Amino acid sequence: MSKKVLIYGATGGIGTATAKKLAARGNRLHLVGRHADRLEALASDLNATFSCGDILSEGFIPQTVRDAGECIDGLVYAIGSITLKGLSRLTHADFIRDYEVNAVSAALAIQAALPALKKSPHAAVVLFSSIAASQGFGMHASIAMAKGALSSLTLSLAAELAPTIRVNAIAPSLTQTPLSQSLWQNETMAQSIAGLHPISRLGSSEDMAGLAAFLLSDEATWITGQIMGVDGGRSTLRVKG
Ligand SMILES: NC(=O)c1ccc[n+]([C@@H]2O[C@H](COP(=O)([O-])OP(=O)(O)OC[C@H]3O[C@@H](n4cnc5c(N)ncnc54)[C@H](OP(=O)(O)O)[C@@H]3O)[C@@H](O)[C@H]2O)c1
């Protein structure tokens, strides 16, 4: 059945791949992004509507929900930031910005969309956490904290909104998108990080989009409150002893 899906971060790597997959399956999309030219081009390709702005701008989140329409079946929050610094270099502003962009704005987006999500017979929300929320990585203190909060938000809202709205999160390991480019643009470094995964490669946006589309679909109507690793086995397996 065709669903109306609101996608935040639609011009990002994972957001775009998710939008393309959902559109190919006949869903109707409302896209949210910061860059008018890229957003307009994607919306035109996918026959979607869109809202352009910064998620932290006053009044922008309620505006995106008004623009999306009265009934929303799916919400994807694929906005994210990454601040990789040692603790002594992290500023108060770094912590607050990562927390607001990754966690608080996700909560506010779901809050604003609640009346529209409640009008859907099978509403579902997909958030993006990170492997760094459950595994300790150096230089990740700020983003790990923010994604840890997002994982907890997933559980809390899944409980609060059941059985009307399902809430799940995907926790990627290193995925080749613009966000993480500094970690994979050097071939030697990319291969070395790929080798840390039991399935020895880096993630792709399509790996994430496949699970996001499944979690939004009617094939997943008994799945809620889950934080699912898409990480080549890195968070759970030790294959080399
Ligand atoms: N890539 C990875 O290795 C990785 C690992 C773990 C978790 N994740 C999570 O996966 C999700 C998708 O990220 P991605 O890898 O696809 O990264 P991406 O390509 O950089 O996409 C992130 C999107 O967030 C948008 N964004 C950032 N700050 C914003 C703001 N203040 N207002 C509005 N939009 C904003 C960016 O907009 P612009 O296009 O305008 O910059 C971009 O579209 C994020 O939640 C990220 O934290 C990614």
Language model features by range: what are they?
Residues 130:
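Residue(s) in the substrate-gating loop at a strand-loop-helix junction
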